[in-house]
């Protein structure tokens, strides 16, 4: 359970609250009840709704807590990642938020492409047996299937929208 200290706005776990109370000459207690929290000037932080990603690049990330109209505190989630302009340092050049986002998307695309290619390679390996001379299969159908697997990286939706061919 997470708890928010009213006087500081600090959010902590229950064990941290117990240590905080002890370090600040506060009380000790067995069970954390509403009465205990009120005496400590603290509130429970409830789990808020996750943000809903709209594409392959986004994810739900926590960004603090917020209070609702009834006064209860909830975890706050936003869509990430969040990019901001970064000034140059001694070791790295300045980078705009747009440049960071483009690099992030390129990295995500490359990782996804590698995963799809790995899956495609495994499917090709799994069907190698169909190409031996004495395999009791329709060689033309299996050859077409294997060619369709090789063509996966040329599909319009690659690497995120793949139409996998059906095995013969």
Q: Can you describe what each PLM-predicted range is?
A:
Residues 1-168:
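A preference for well-ordered globular domain cores
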